[in-house]
Amino acid sequence: MWRLPGVRAALRGVRTAVERRSRTEAASETSVGAMERAVVRCVPSEPKLSLSFALADGSHKNMQRDQSEPLGRALSRIATNALKGHAKVAAAKKSRKNRPNAGSGVACAGPGPEPAAACEPVVKLYYREEAVAEDVLNVDAWQDGAVLQIGDVKYKVERNPPAFTELQLPRYIMAGFPVCPKLGVEFGDPTGSLFRWYKETKPRAAEPEGGGPSSSSPSSPSPGWTETGVDERVYTPSNADIGLRLKLHCTPGNGQRFGPSRELESVCPVEAGPGTCTFDHRHLYTKKVTDDALIRTVSYNILADTYAQTEFSRTVLYPYCAPYALELDYRQNLIQKELTGYNADLICLQEVDRCVFTDSLMPALEAFGLEGVFRIKQHEGLATFYRKSKFSLLSQHDIAFHEALQSDPLHKELLEKLALYPSAQERVLQRSSVVQVSVLQSTKDSSKKICVANTHLYWHPKGGYIRLIQMAVALAHIRHVSCDLYPGIPVIFCGDFNSTPSTGMYHFVINGSIAEDHEDWTSNGEEERCNMSLSHFFKLKSACGEPAYTNYVGGFHGCLDYIFIDLHALEVEQVIPLPSHEEVTTHQALPSVSHPSDHIALVCDLKWK
């Protein structure tokens, strides 16, 4: 929930005032013969422009015209369409006039004289009260604020107003779980748009068995809707909403102007949640946002949809998980609720699909005061979110390991060592892993800055030496950022390191060095041996210690995820307890209907020293 009620109330007041003013102006304009809308979409990268408007007969016209076409041709086409619309109206009137009287059964009088053929209406385009010449090209003629006149009807031209290019509600909507529409806005942005949520006044009658007609048939009256009182992009249904469908009324905007509003209704009604989730008990420790002296940090591999929705995942990796619980729409409900319930200041996520970041995580977490940045890897990527009231983003320094190793002089010595082992070098350079590095500055004390790193190292069980090389590149790069670019700033390094505490990678991070004879240098056999000694100057600690596991699937469980912190500048205030073993294994393993990933989030409160 919001922890800034004053700000939220002020924002709601602004939105309400804008909506009220828009409705008042619309009513005022209507009373004096307000102009209809003619919406023009014209972008330089496309050869055609689109023109959309409603004719007097109620039909809606969508036209595509070449931008390089003279205006006169477009106006002529509009006149033809208007004439056809007029003819349809006349034909409908004639048909009604000749229809037998339903009450007496007596036919109406004869048709009488035929009406005169309708003439093509005069169509003109005006700009600043002057007619636009018909030889002007469409691209130049259709300006914002121009007036299109079709016969006696005038239309105000709106060129490139904000518009939704995509608008969709999730399939699964559950009580107690945030609902965030998937949307795309052209010539605008979600933050400048208006939203209002409604719910049905009563549930729809269920469709009878056998597929017979139900209360939702076309002949049935439309369902009644009640305002929920929520005017944000994200809505969290309550238990009182179970069985009711939701409706969202939204108006695209950019902070200065608004486009045509749209409405969408949920396909399915709100369902009951899955019961107790693995994170519910953890939320008891994170009910409030921490004070300025603390940094609540989360690291979490949320399981990319690109991996969850494969036949291999369903039949081999997670055969114990109900298929619907692997679907993205379902898992997003749980992920959003889990993350928002931590009230975190920093969230580092791995295995984030691009669409999940833009359409789900960004809007949902933004509503709770967080801003985020994304780094794509290949099929998925990394996301780092920070609380806007505590931090601002100063700079980003993301790298791909294989690119940095080959091109950055910082890693010249390491590359020379690796070049002595061609087979190992080839394998290392084939990997697409990245590290996301963000420098944040405290909004309360500008002298306090922090380097936040986030990564997902190579996954293969026999890739120990590859992870060692990747970690050496990461730590050298982080040192450059935290010592050379921003001297002396502390480091928080989160991620899925795919390494248990017994591995060389973990030993290297915690102890600051690794010997050339460590067994991980031959993790994939003698052919890929690459013995070398490595060291780094950081003093790092695992903030959450060494849990028994952070990854729990049918065939494996172990600790793979860590939040490494700079011992010189940070200390641990508290670690949020992980779910109990009973909670994790309630449905055999992870993921499950009550847990959205095969990993468990690490959550801790850090304190500046």
Curated annotation (Swiss-Prot):
Name of this chain's protein: 2',5'-phosphodiesterase 12
Chain residue ranges for the region called Disordered: 203-231
Gene: PDE12
Cofactor requirement: Mg(2+)
Reactions accelerated catalytically: Exonucleolytic cleavage of poly(A) to 5'-AMP
UniProt GO MF annotations: 3'-5'-RNA exonuclease activity; metal ion binding; poly(A)-specific ribonuclease activity
A single GO cellular-component term on record: mitochondrion
Active site: 496 (proton donor/acceptor)
Residue stretch of the organelle transit peptide: 1-16
Role: Enzyme that cleaves 2',5'-phosphodiester bond linking adenosines of the 5'-triphosphorylated oligoadenylates, triphosphorylated oligoadenylates referred as 2-5A modulates the 2-5A system. Degrades triphosphorylated 2-5A to produce AMP and ATP. Also cleaves 3',5'-phosphodiester bond of oligoadenylates. Plays a role as a negative regulator of the 2-5A system that is one of the major pathways for antiviral and antitumor functions induced by interferons (IFNs). Suppression of this enzyme increases cellular 2-5A levels and decreases viral replication in cultured small-airway epithelial cells.
Pfam families linked: Exo_endo_phos (PF03372), PDE12-like_N (PF21171)
GO biological process: antiviral innate immune response; cellular response to dsRNA; cellular response to interferon-alpha; cellular response to type II interferon; mitochondrial mRNA catabolic process; mRNA processing; nuclear-transcribed mRNA catabolic process, deadenylation-dependent decay; positive regulation of viral genome replication
Record-stated family: Belongs to the CCR4/nocturin family.
Domain of life: Eukaryota
Keywords: Exonuclease, Hydrolase, Magnesium, Metal-binding, Mitochondrion, mRNA processing, Nuclease, Phosphoprotein, Transit peptide
Phosphoserine PTM positions: 217
Catalytic activity, EC: 3.1.4.-, 3.1.13.4
Protein residues bound to Mg(2+) 1: 351
